[in-house]
């Protein structure tokens, strides 16, 4: 979510021209056709099972992904970043939970929360509060919680556990940053993530806002959908190829199982509106391990790290990522024990 009335609209041309994205969608469509038993795309045995699971995960997750993108684009277009600045107390300690609450009220994709956080800092919001919003917006928004409830319809407490763990993680990360954060490492990128300028005017008219909304939605949707397709394919492959006994064998070493889910959440880089359906497909792992996957993913993944490097610099990432990762893992484990009775 960019602060549209405070920043230029994003172009969706690049994602749409991505050859990788085109190839991924072509493969996905081919697999979809195969589910209707087309002789042209017929798949044998386990490959058919993989294709069926891949399509099922994508079809379940896609409506929530679209809904999340539309909500994010609406806020990006019509809610100025200055509004968030006015909502945040001047006291940095209380600004952290206030920014977290703003993340619930103003949901957005994790990708788009990075420029919003940068804009908030430039408006005088404390870095800890701005970064708390960066974490809360994709983790605590209502679309994410509803999608989790749908994905885990047989385990309704998972949605509440995810919300509780994310709240704890956001607060811990924000307050820890007040203690260990080095704000001098934050890089200035005013032109790339900055204010309206004569060369980059704000969206002021209704037509401009409509174009900004469309561009913001497309710019969020295509990368997120590509990550969903790839993540669902890998999750389906794990489900089909890796024996359930392997995960069951890790039950005796729950920390190792949790480490596996942490790595998967970082590597897959899924959109938070869709990741619950991928997590639910890992039926052989414990609920707490699934919860760790759901909490870590929207806060720390490869695409977020890359965006934070560009927005804030290497020194910031080297401090911020460990703080967030430890907060997310610890909160998910503690909440998992409370809700599910163990790791």
Which residues does each PLM region occupy?
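Selected transmembrane alpha-helices and immediately adjacent juxtamembrane segments
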Residues: 2-3, 9-73, 160-262, 321-343
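N-terminal, well-ordered alpha-helical segments
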Residues: 52, 56, 69, 73, ...
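Short helix-loop boundary/capping segments at the starts of domains
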Residues: 56, 60-67, 75-76, 80, ...
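Membrane-embedded helical hairpins/re-entrant loop segments and their flanking transmembrane helices
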Residues: 71-102, 246-252, 278-279
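Membrane-interfacial helix-loop connectors
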Residues: 103-161, 242-316
């Amino acid at each position: 979510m960019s602060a549209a009335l405070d920043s230029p609209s994003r172009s969706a041309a690049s994602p749409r021209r991505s050859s990788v994205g085109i190839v991924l969608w072509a493969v996905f469509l081919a697999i979809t056709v195969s589910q209707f038993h087309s002789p042209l795309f017929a798949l044998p045995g386990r490959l058919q099972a993989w294709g069926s699971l891949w399509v099922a995960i994508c079809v379940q997750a896609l409506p929530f992904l679209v809904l999340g993108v539309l909500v994010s684009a609406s806020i990006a277009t019509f809610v100025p970043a200055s509004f968030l600045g006015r909502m945040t107390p001047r006291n940095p300690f209380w600004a952290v939970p206030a920014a977290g609450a703003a993340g619930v009220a103003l949901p957005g994709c994790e990708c788009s929360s990075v420029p919003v956080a940068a804009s908030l800092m430039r408006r005088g919001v404390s870095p800890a509060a701005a970064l708390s919003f960066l974490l809360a917006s994709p983790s605590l928004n209502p679309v994410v919680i509803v999608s989790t409830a749908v994905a885990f319809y047989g385990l309704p407490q998972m949605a509440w556990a995810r919300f509780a763990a994310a709240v704890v993680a956001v607060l811990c990360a924000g307050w820890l940053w007040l203690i260990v954060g080095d704000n001098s490492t934050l890089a200035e990128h005013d032109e790339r993530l900055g204010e309206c300028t004569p060369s980059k005017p704000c969206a002021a008219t209704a037509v401009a806002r409509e174009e900004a909304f469309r561009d913001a939605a497309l710019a969020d949707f295509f990368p997120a959908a590509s990550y969903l397709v790839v993540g669902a394919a890998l999750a389906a492959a794990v489900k089909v190829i890796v024996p359930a006994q392997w995960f069951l064998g890790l039950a005796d070493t729950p920390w190792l199982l949790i480490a596996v889910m942490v790595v998967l959440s970082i590597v897959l880089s899924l959109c938070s509106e869709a990741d619950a359906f991928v997590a639910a497909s890992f039926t052989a792992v414990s609920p707490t391990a699934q919860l760790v996957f759901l909490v870590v993913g929207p806060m720390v993944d490869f695409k977020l790290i890359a965006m934070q490097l560009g927005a804030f610099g290497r020194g910031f990432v080297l401090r911020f990522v460990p703080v967030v990762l430890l907060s997310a893992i610890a909160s998910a484990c503690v909440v998992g024990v409370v809700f599910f009775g163990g790791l």
